[in-house]
Amino acid sequence: MMRNQNLLNYIKNVLEHMPTDWLLLTTHRLDIYNEEQAKTEFLNQLDSLFETKVFSTSALAELPTAFDYIRLGHPLSSILEWTIAGLQGLQAEQVVAFASQTMPVLSVLRKNLLQHKHTHIYYSEELPAEFDFEALKQVYGYQFEVKQVKHIEDVHSFDGSTVFLSKTASFKTLDLHPSIDFLVQLDEELGSVLVANGDSSKNYIPDIQHVRRRESIAMTPPNAFAALQKLVGQTPTSHSKKEEQANRSSVINSIHNITDTSSEVVLGSCGLSVQYAIMMGLIDHAQQNYPDQPIKIIVPPNCYGGTND
């Protein structure tokens, strides 16, 4: 209990003294990036700073880069995962923060489809409208059952994976019931956090990270910052919807100007996620409009790895 309070106090100081580019950066510093160690090196040095109670801006700025792309992760998402894991007595790798609320579930379903393993998805509160389970079955071919329960204690383990979806005001208190393999903590404004619960779930982590890397993005720097503020009991810095809309309009105008078109623009979190959405949207369209026709995907041999995926 004392260590948890010390951890939260330390995070308060980190948020107060962190380098400004942690929140605003769009490109990582590769001069302090070691690809072979990457996030491990970042967390090891963060551990050392925590143990020695060092949180100066200069010390935090010298922490090595954990990822080579912002969409894969960044200092604030890494610290969020590290903090949640520390509060729960878990390893940092067991916690994965997503910008999306649905992608954590898809990452487990994808792994289980390849492993020919069934999945039970439980929830107690009303789910966000983004969860279209019928589409997941029809378009992706995922095999799972969805069950609503009153309490987390009503979840029963079976010879497969159990996923529990929870909505909360904070990521601080997680109910890791032993019958749950994966807890997905949802925040409608910030994204979600997936926790791999128990030793048997740890071998899913590379596959979960793979989906976040190739088909989605990590929780964004501003949202990870807000989540950390919630963790330490602070009121999250207000996010201006007006500013967000202005930025969105600016991007759309740029697209219209560059392409010399006036067609509708749909924006995504990153290039790979847009490609992914286009591909799965085409499959969904084909299934609905040409149900008796086979679907074939042609991938050129020199296609970029992420697109191949």
For the regions a protein language model found, what residue spans apply to each?
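Conserved N-terminal alpha-helix of the aminotransferase class I/II PLP-enzyme fold
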Residues: M2-L106, R110-D309
